[in-house]
Amino acid sequence: MLRQILSQAKKHPSLIPLFVFIGTGASGATLYLLRLALFNPDVCWDRNNPEPWNKLGPNDQYKFYSVNVDYSKLKKERPDF
């Protein structure tokens, strides 16, 4: 399959940006799904810890992007579990 893509790119060089953008988008989507699967507290891979979000403190940032929130200055306002 890679050989066919390279032969098409040699015959039609205008397809090269299309292959680059599709490859970049696919790799970005894969990395984002990997990030969600490994670092999101809503996903639990360990059956011994069914509620991993209870271990998160108010200083832990698990959002992908937060605009104006400084997580280091937040107080703990919930009970320990």
Curated annotation (Swiss-Prot):
Chain positions found as N6-acetyllysine: 10
UniProt key word rRNA-binding: no
Transmembrane segment boundaries: 15-37
Subcellular location, record wording: Mitochondrion inner membrane
Residues in the signal sequence: none
One GO cellular component, as annotated: mitochondrial inner membrane
InterPro entries on file: B12D
PANTHER family documented for this protein: CYTOCHROME C OXIDASE SUBUNIT NDUFA4, NADH-UBIQUINONE OXIDOREDUCTASE MLRQ SUBUNIT
Assembly with partners or alone: Component of the cytochrome c oxidase (complex IV, CIV), a multisubunit enzyme composed of 14 subunits. The complex is composed of a catalytic core of 3 subunits MT-CO1, MT-CO2 and MT-CO3, encoded in the mitochondrial DNA, and 11 supernumerary subunits COX4I, COX5A, COX5B, COX6A, COX6B, COX6C, COX7A, COX7B, COX7C, COX8 and NDUFA4, which are encoded in the nuclear genome.
Stated role: Component of the cytochrome c oxidase, the last enzyme in the mitochondrial electron transport chain which drives oxidative phosphorylation. The respiratory chain contains 3 multisubunit complexes succinate dehydrogenase (complex II, CII), ubiquinol-cytochrome c oxidoreductase (cytochrome b-c1 complex, complex III, CIII) and cytochrome c oxidase (complex IV, CIV), that cooperate to transfer electrons derived from NADH and succinate to molecular oxygen, creating an electrochemical gradient over the inner membrane that drives transmembrane transport and the ATP synthase.
UniProt name for this protein: Cytochrome c oxidase subunit NDUFA4
Organism taxonomic ancestry: Eukaryota, Metazoa, Chordata, Craniata, Vertebrata
